[in-house]
């Protein structure tokens, strides 16, 4: 009897930020499943609403009603993850009512299990005690670039998944040597555009955390050689840490890894669509998906 084929679980950006996009894409994904690779699925969608004190990584911009967001996830049996990865939280911030209300809502959903992406140990301890039905993801904002630290994080039972820094994506010898239980917890950040040699990544995340807290502090000025151009998917593909669809299917899945995070909460929905075309859609159906989402014979670009 042949071994079951492994499945890649994608963790997609924009739970709140791209609600309107997913309201169109998810019915398409269900209705025309043959357009998409049968070896992958949507493991979760993550994000945070605007003005979210516990938020981190990016400044949230979503404003849609959380109940409608959760209802959409339940309708399509997809896990929702709250991105609460602020690294600078203090005890007084735990009383923030809007974030607590989100946790109460998502913890009591009764559908697929929902999670929280966290950085702060203080917040992790509080959420574990207060909302035990939620699971937890160790955030890439911890910038785990030392493999020994990654392995230690994977050993922590409180985390269901751990997102290492993208610069460990090609540490193949060490990744291959991980036990299966650890491999199941690794969630690779695939499409990072950050400069591979960046020494300011932690400071950048801390600047975002301060901004979400409404506190003054230095802005993080990107020192990458091509920073002025902003995010370009074509440039991300040239990053030494990039994981593309071929590598997922032919390298990472055979090694025993199955969880892949796509970044992009702060980008536009047109780029999100390009990510989904690259990672999930059979090339023969790229145009079909574009036509279903936005492309018609009256669309003008200029």
Over which residues does each language-model region extend?
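Active-site pocket-lining/capping segments in soluble small-molecule metabolic enzymes
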Residues: 2-149, 153, 159-302
């Amino acid at each position: 009897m042949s071994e079951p084929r492994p499945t890649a679980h994608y963790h997609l950006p924009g739970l709140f930020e791209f609600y309107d996009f997913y309201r169109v894409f998810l019915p398409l994904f269900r209705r025309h499943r043959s357009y998409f690779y049968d070896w992958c699925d949507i493991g979760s969608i993550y994000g945070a609403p605007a003005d979210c004190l516990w938020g981190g990584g990016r400044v949230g911009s979503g404003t849609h009603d959380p109940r409608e967001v959760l209802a959409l996830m339940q309708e399509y049996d997809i896990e929702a993850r709250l991105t609460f990865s602020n690294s600078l939280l203090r005890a007084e911030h735990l009383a923030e009512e809007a974030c607590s209300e989100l946790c109460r809502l998502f913890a009591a959903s009764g559908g697929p299990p929902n999670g929280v992406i966290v950085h702060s140990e203080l917040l992790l301890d509080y959420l574990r005690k207060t909302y035990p039905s939620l699971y937890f993801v160790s955030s890439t904002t911890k910038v785990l670039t030392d493999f020994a630290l990654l392995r230690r994080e994977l050993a922590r039972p409180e985390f269901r998944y751990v997102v290492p820094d993208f610069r460990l994506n090609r540490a193949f010898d060490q990744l291959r040597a991980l036990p299966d239980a650890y491999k199941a917890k690794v969630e690779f950040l695939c499409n990072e555009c950050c400069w591979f040699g960046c020494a300011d990544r932690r400071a950048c995340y801390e600047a975002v955390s301060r901004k979400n807290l409404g506190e003054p502090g230095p802005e993080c000025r990107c020192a990458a050689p091509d920073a002025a151009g902003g995010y370009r998917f074509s440039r991300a593909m040239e990053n030494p840490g990039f994981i593309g669809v071929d590598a997922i299917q032919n390298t990472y899945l055979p090694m025993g890894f199955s969880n892949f995070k796509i970044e992009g909460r702060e980008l536009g929905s047109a780029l999100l669509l390009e990510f989904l075309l690259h990672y999930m859609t059979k090339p023969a159906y790229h145009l079909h998906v574009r036509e279903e989402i936005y492309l018609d014979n009256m669309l003008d670009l200029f």
